[in-house]
């Protein structure tokens, strides 16, 4: 029987005798089983085809994304992006210890940012020296041996009640007082930590209003926070240049007893410090200061550049930082890990607004004016700088001439400012007119607090998150004089374009310039030749310490 003849029929098969060939019951039953078998065969073939397709797809996926036990698939508070989905997030298998800068062994869940931040930025071209890595590991051992609660700490604490001490103790300390705005605090704390490394001291951090809410513990096995029962804590606010244990005051009034060793000294290194306070940066004075077991420091300065001008520190600094303009880049990434709450602010915003962009541009706007703004001359300055430096495209006001690009480049612009007007101005410009290049520009601003609120925890949490977000951009524009911008450029290893400070509310010409290095500026350096005991331009003594681009009298490493 021709089976195909039954499949080819277009008219129904009838069992009656009229009009069509009659078919008996046995033939009809045979046709039914043949049809049923054909349908089963078709379904089986289709199922196999689907299964094969799925297996091929899985094979391709796992070939592109090899399994890795160190890969972080996700987390509740601040999810790490999948590098296969978001190409602007660096390789998930990147070096989470930052070339040995960070120590292993921390509880990762207690501080997500410590090891996960590497996934959100490009690998740094600046590698820490083996000497710096060794120095940090040795410091961690010292901190664990001498930190709060240890027998050595308890023994040293008893010395505070004495006027003078006999002999050298096992451990010496430098206490950093929490003082000034967040940017200043971060920079000054990094400076004091470097001083601790150079002098084999243990750094203890006054938590102030919010230091423990903002930053994780950086040292394994021992807190860096000054205990709440430290006997001098209630004196911190009152310490100034006229305090009896202020080193500058003692030098000025010639009351230093060189025969004995003082139990403690107060070092006033705030921007308003005097010439006698600045003697701290003289090698002879460091010899005396180095014997004192307890140093209490109040500063709002990034005084690292002047440490390089102290001959006794020069060799050690050169070994620690062969690339001299990497000091804050390395120490900042070592010390300052945002707490999980702050890290959540960073990652949620990054994922929502920045992760899909082909290029990320950061613009940090700080206006030192009594009026809140926004100011037209500042908006003009931002546009002039970003367009002349080819960071952002110009707009074409003749819409009919706008370029059509099949796959336009997407740039995400992150604006941080106390005022919303500057971001809104950019957003409106790139919404109302097409770009001359066909690029798509998205403008985003996480917060607009209106004015600086130094003592508010949430304000500082947002500020830290924004500094960190700026550090994750590909290119950065910062404002002159701003420590906020200094922190971002240092953490990100970025040489920013600096918006020069306007005068008389007029847009500067040129509007901005490229920084010599990513290092912060020391705003209030000493101008004193310790040997000649006379004034001198300290920005011309060595080739790697120069005057800053944004503050002519400031010093920075280059």
UniProtKB/Swiss-Prot annotation:
Q: Which InterPro entries match?
A: XG_FTase (IPR004938)
Enzyme Commission no: 2.4.1.-
Annotated Gene Ontology cellular component terms: Golgi apparatus; Golgi cisterna membrane; Golgi medial cisterna; Golgi membrane
Q: Ranges in the Lumenal compartment? A: 65-558
Transmembrane regions: 44-64
Pfam families named in the record: XG_FTase (PF03254)
Q: Which UniProt keywords apply?
A: Cell wall biogenesis/degradation, Glycoprotein, Glycosyltransferase, Golgi apparatus, Membrane, Signal-anchor, Transferase, Transmembrane, Transmembrane helix
In the record, biological process GO terms are: cell wall biogenesis; cell wall organization; xyloglucan biosynthetic process
GO molecular function (one): galactoside 2-alpha-L-fucosyltransferase activity
Which top EC class applies here?
transferase
Tissue specificity, per the record, is: Expressed in roots, stems, leaves, flowers, siliques and seedlings.
State the annotated membrane topology for this chain: Single-pass type II membrane protein
What subcellular locations does the record give? Golgi apparatus, Golgi stack membrane; Golgi apparatus membrane
Q: Which Gene3D superfamilies match?
A: 3.40.50.11340, 3.40.50.11350
User: How does this chain assemble?
Assistant: Homodimer. Interacts with MUR3, XLT2, XXT2 and XXT5.
Q: What does this protein do?
A: Involved in cell wall biosynthesis. Is both necessary and sufficient for the addition of the terminal fucosyl residue on xyloglucan side chains, but is not involved in the fucosylation of other cell wall components. Associates with other xyloglucan-synthesizing enzymes to form multiprotein complexes for xyloglucan synthesis in the Golgi.
Q: What does the sequence similarity comment in the record state about its family?
A: Belongs to the glycosyltransferase 37 family.
UniProt-recorded name of the protein? Galactoside 2-alpha-L-fucosyltransferase
Q: What is the lineage of its organism?
A: Eukaryota, Viridiplantae, Streptophyta, Embryophyta, Tracheophyta
């Amino acid at each position: 029987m021709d089976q195909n003849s039954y499949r080819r029929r277009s008219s129904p098969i009838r069992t009656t005798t009229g009009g069509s060939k009659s078919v008996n019951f046995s033939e009809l039953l045979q046709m039914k089983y043949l049809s049923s078998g054909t349908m089963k065969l078709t379904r089986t073939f289709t199922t196999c085809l689907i299964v094969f397709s799925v297996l091929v797809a899985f094979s391709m996926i796992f070939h592109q994304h090899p399994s890795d036990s160190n890969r972080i698939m996700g987390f509740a508070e601040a999810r790490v992006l999948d590098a296969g989905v978001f190409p602007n997030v660096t390789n998930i298998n990147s070096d989470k210890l930052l070339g040995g800068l960070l120590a292993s062994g921390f509880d990762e869940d207690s501080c997500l940012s410590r090891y996960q931040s590497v996934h959100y930025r490009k690998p740094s071209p600046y590698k820490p020296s083996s000497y710096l890595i060794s120095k940090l590991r040795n410091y961690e051992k010292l901190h664990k041996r001498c930190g709060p609660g240890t027998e050595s700490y308890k023994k040293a604490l008893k010395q505070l009640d004495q006027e003078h001490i006999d002999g050298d103790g096992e451990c010496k300390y430098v206490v950093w007082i929490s003082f000034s705005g967040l940017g200043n605090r971060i920079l000054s704390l990094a400076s004091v930590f470097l001083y601790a490394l150079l002098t084999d001291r243990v750094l203890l951090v006054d938590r102030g209003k919010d230091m423990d809410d903002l930053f994780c513990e950086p040292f394994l096995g021992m807190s860096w926070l000054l205990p709440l029962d430290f006997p001098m804590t209630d004196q911190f606010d009152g310490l100034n240049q006229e305090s009896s244990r202020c080193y500058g005051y003692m030098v000025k009034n010639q009351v230093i007893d060189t025969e004995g060793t003082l139990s403690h000294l107060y070092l006033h290194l705030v921007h308003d410090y005097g010439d006698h306070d600045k003697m701290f940066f003289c090698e002879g004075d460091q010899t005396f200061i180095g014997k004192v077991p307890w140093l209490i420091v109040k500063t709002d300065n990034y005084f690292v550049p002047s440490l390089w001008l102290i001959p006794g520190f020069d060799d050690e600094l050169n070994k620690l930082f062969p690339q001299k303009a990497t000091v804050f880049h390395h120490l900042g990434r070592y010390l300052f890990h945002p707490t999980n709450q702050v890290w959540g602010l960073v990652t949620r915003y990054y994922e929502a607004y920045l992760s899909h962009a082909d290029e990320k541009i950061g613009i940090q706007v700080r206006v030192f004016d009594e009026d809140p703004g926004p100011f037209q001359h500042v908006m003009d300055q931002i546009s002039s700088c970003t367009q002349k430096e080819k960071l952002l495209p110009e707009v074409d006001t003749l819409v009919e001439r706008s370029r059509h690009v099949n796959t336009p480049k997407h740039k995400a612009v992150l604006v941080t400012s106390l005022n919303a007007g500057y971001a809104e101005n950019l957003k409106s410009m790139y919404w109302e007119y097409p770009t001359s290049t066909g690029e798509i520009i998205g403008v985003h601003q996480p917060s607009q607090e209106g004015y600086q609120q130094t003592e508010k925890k949430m304000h500082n949490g947002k500020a830290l998150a924004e500094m960190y977000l700026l550090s994750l951009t590909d290119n950065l524009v910062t404002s002159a004089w701003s420590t906020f911008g200094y922190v971002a450029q240092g953490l990100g290893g970025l040489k920013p374009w600096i918006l020069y400070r306007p005068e008389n509310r007029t847009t500067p010409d040129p509007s901005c310039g490229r920084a010599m290095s990513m290092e912060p500026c020391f705003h209030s350096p000493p101008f004193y030749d310790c040997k000649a005991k006379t004034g001198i331009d300290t920005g011309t003594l060595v080739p790697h310490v120069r005057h800053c681009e944004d503050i002519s009298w400031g010093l920075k490493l280059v």
